[in-house]
Structures are given as C-alpha cells and as structure tokens.
C-alpha cells in the first residue's frame, strides 16, 4: 500500500504495517458497509499474525483525513496458503449495522415512525439516528419473522427512506440525498465515467390502492412529483416511451392515507432516480458515501450537475486509493407472487373496543403470544344498522386470517371450540339435525330438525317453542300482553283460562302445555 494508512485492531495499530497488501471498503444503500483487509501472513503452520478474532473492532484511517474510512467489527478471518508456503490473511469486518441482521425478536412497536424504530433498534450499538424525514406514523408494528435489519429496511423502504452509517450515526434519507455536493471533475478527480439515460423503469406517477384492515375502509393515494437529488439539465420524458401513465400497486394493507402516500412516493422516487445514472472511478475520498450528493463537472452540459450516490467501493492498494461510485437506485425486487394470506389461532384478551367498532383484542400463541391488537371480527350481514353481532369473549379461541402474513392486519374469522366440548353438537343418527346458538349465560335459540321444533329460551326458564302440533309461550316471570291503542284478538275453537298459582320450571311447563292441548282436543 503506497499511501499512509492507519489500521487499528481493538484500538492498537498493526504491529507490522508493511504486511498490509490491500484494503477494500464496500458500502451501498440499506446494507452494512463491509471492509476486507488483506495481509501477508506467517507461512506454514505458524500462528495467525495479527492474532485477530471475530468480534474485534477494526478502524481504518487515511493520512491527513479527519474522518475514518471505516469503523466496524470483525466477523470472519481467513487464511489462504499457496504451494510455496506463502500465506495471506483476510480479515472481513462490517460496520455496526451488521448486528441488526443477527437479531430477531418477537415484539410489538406501538405508534412508531421509521426514525423512532431506528432509534429503538440501534440502542446499544453506539449509533445515533439522524433522519431527513421521519416517515409516516404506524399505529402498530409486529416483529415476528424479520431480523431487526429486515424490519427496519422494510419500514423505511415503504416510506421511501434509505439507511447508511456515517461515522457514529445512522442516517435515514430519501433519494434526494444529503449534504453539500462534493465536486468531482472528469480528467482531474474522476478517471473514468459512464452516464446512462435509461427509461426502462420510467413512470410519470405512482398510485397505491389498499384498505384499512380494522376499519374495512378503502384507501388510495397518488404521488406525482419525485424526491430526487439529481439536478441536471437533461430531463427525460417517460412519455417518449409510452410510460406517461400511472403505475398502481394494489391490495396494500395500511392504517392511514399517510402510509399509502409514502409508499406511492417511494415507488416514484426510485423510478425517477433510475432515469439518468452515473458510475465511475474517482480519486479516493472517505467522504464519498451512499446518500452523499456529488457535483459532476468536465462532462457535456446536459449531464453535468448534482447526483446522489447509492453505492461506493473504496480500494487502497499499491495503485493508491480509488473510489468506484454509482448513483443507480436499488432495483425492484424479483417479480414474485404477493405474500399469501395465512390463518392462525388467536386468543381473545379483550372485547371492550375503545373505538366502539366491534373489534376484539387478540394474542397469537403461534407467534410467541404477540399482541396483534384490536382486530376486526367477521360478522354475517354486517353493514350500517344491520347484521349479526356475535363477538367472542375473553379467553375464547379464534381463527385469524392474516392478509399478506402480517399479524397487525389480521381479521377474526370466527371462534373455535378446540379442545372444549360443544354444549350441543346437534348430531342425531350421524347427521347434523340441530342448530343452536347460546350465550355464555344461557340465553338460547335452537332449530331442531329432529324434533321439528324452534325454541327461543332465556336462562331464567322462559321460552317460546314452536312445534307442528303445539306452540307454547311460557313465562318464568310475570307475563304482560300489551297493545296500547290497538286491538287484541284471541281466536280459537275454544278459549280456556286456567288458574296456576305455583311457578313451574321449563320442563314441567312444556309437559303441562302438551297435556292441556290434548285435553282440549288438540295435538
């Protein structure tokens, strides 16, 4: 290495800097920066020199530069042996962001923005958080299958935000970039450059259509102006290639218009950033990082101006310090089917919905008892002023549908008896012959095909029973027949009024009714 470089391991400089053969630091949006050190090692079976172990801290600084080229933690150590006995040691390290992809917990975040989530996840990593935009506030966010880094990248990405470590801070920024543009001039500080105008991903507007899973409300938002840090005279027109329409993402669950607006904005930002991109090789500068703005000069006027870096690779070796850079935004993920809806079991913990929307609060045992929050409950015929309302009770087991596999978007499909025996399965001779509905305190409706009866009963013993041969109305308490201002008509072959001074239970009353009907010449 022909440029003065200070490499430290656990705060101590290398014992023999002359053994350093090369340094490579690669950084791109939303990924931990990687540093690889290549050193000449002791030949044969000699001990590793330097004696570096995973977990050691590594720092790389260039002579005369205030900011570090890299600060991070060793994750891998390799030794490569040649047939002549010579050996190379390769030490691979990542910046502190790498620890987020090694952690995965089951937990719930309430009322959190992307910036606040980053602050919580980075607590203990020695990284502060600086955000150009906080992103929309999410009512409820469940971490269940993601690592910390995957969760943060997904939440930030849906808000059009990108991640990058800058010294002791984690920056969240849009594709507008940050900082004053760093000047780069072709023929002076830039050795090679390629500028590309590409309308393959062009789009004039982006729209998102979705729905609120708890309120069952349709949502829709649109973005028509991108946040782009590229400021050059060349302005490609998507209409030149027939891309002046609206690109629409559909069936997106979200709890607010802000969420969907941010998602639409993120899509448009990426499409516009890809219209004109630059990549090249420049004189090495540690200040060149993903997210930084650069000002290209010495090129034709239409493409001269400001761009935003998305990827940089620093190399320090016998040829000096060079930086390869690129401004192309991350590409779209491979085309795939949307995440499938899944179903899982839930346990109801509360039904006293603070918003009065008939929801149930549910935990998910198969997800580590994560609190999914207040979920909508499927009710037959539900609508304004109508429908069947039959909510579960606390401790009931329910079946929950998870659109896109997301617990926070769940919908309760219904309750399950599970291991609890039904109070009346209604099976007669191997057929389902009786349907029934019963509340927890014993009010019931029974439709009995086997007995050809319809019965409505209270827990106190009052009932109305309809059979082909007999209809019985029995009151366990006082009975009032009332039609104020209207006529009351009692018709029959005979009409009898009998005195019954003693109360009777429901079974006795039903038997007495059948006896009286037969004695009067009925069924």
Descriptions of predicted regions:
Residues 1-54, 94-98, 185, 194, ...:
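Juxtamembrane "anchor/assembly" segments of surface/extracellular structural proteins
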Residues 101-108, 157, 166-240, 264-281, ...:
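Surface-exposed, non-catalytic interaction/assembly patches
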Residues 78-93, 279, 315-328, 356-361, ...:
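Short, solvent-exposed secondary-structure boundary/capping segments
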Residues 46-132, 141:
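Surface-exposed cap/loop segments at beta↔alpha junctions
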Residues 65-73, 301-310, 405-415:
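Short, Lys/Arg- and Gly-enriched loop/turn segments at beta-strand edges
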Residues 81, 88-97, 133-200, 409-416:
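Short beta-strand-centered interaction patches in the first periplasmic/extracellular domains
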Residues 119-121, 153-155, 198-200, 208, ...:
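Right-handed beta-helix
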Residues 32, 37, 53, 93, ...:
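Amphipathic, non-transmembrane alpha-helical segments in extracytoplasmic/periplasmic proteins
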